[in-house]
Amino acid sequence: DKGLSNYWGYNSIGFFAPHAEYAATGQNGDQENEFKELVKAYHKAGIEVILDVVYNHTAEGNHLGPTLSFRGIDNHNYYRLEQEHPIYYTDYTGTGNTLNLLSSRTLQLVMDSLRYWATEMQVDGFRFDLASALARGLYDVGKLSTFLDTIHQDPVISQLKLIAEPWDLGEGGYQVGNFPVLWAEWNGKYR
């Protein structure tokens, strides 16, 4: 009913709002207030809140997907596009697109979102879905990527718990053991 297909919660269309259906009423911004109350209650009980975030792709899919947000604003800055055929999206995520964290505009959006969740919503850390896609340079994944360097230098985010899902679908994307020292990693093979 929202024009979204294959939507299971990991196909974001906005990075600053809890999903409305997670709130008791699901309307009028209740989800934000309820999330804040939830975090306060967990903290009062001595439980930290780690937010699972998806900054590697959006619900807009590939070049045939719907225009829901970034595609309609500034496609070439928000998405990684194929160099030889920029109508097509680079897809390290298996969803049809990959956000372009090499773009200062996109990186700023992600950092603003992280700071919002940390300062306004008071979460204690983040688990980054397909974190290798976030740490890619032009072709490979690197500890010295712009994204990881920006996280390391941020006075708020660098002090939180940071957990990488250390892989993506691109060549060399499996990066277990290769994220910087301050990061914890999920080991999918260990399960």
Feature names for model-found ranges:
Residues I50, R127, I163:
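Generic enzyme active-site microenvironment
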Residues D1-Q122, L130-Q153:
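Substrate-binding/active-site clefts of carbohydrate-active enzymes
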